[in-house]
Amino acid sequence: AELPQGLWVRPRLG
């Protein structure tokens, strides 16, 4: 998981 687990999932949820 090299991607920011808070940048690609945050905007998706709101």
From Swiss-Prot:
Family listed: Belongs to the pyrokinin family.
Subcellular location: Secreted
Any one Gene Ontology cellular component term annotated for this protein: extracellular region
Chain's role: Myoactive.
The protein's name in its UniProt record: Pyrokinin-4
Chain positions found as Glycine amide: 14
Organism field: Pachyphasma brandbergense (Gladiator)
GO biological process: neuropeptide signaling pathway
Main location: secreted
Coiled-coil stretches noted in the UniProt entry, renumbered to this chain: none
Keywords: Amidation, Neuropeptide, Secreted
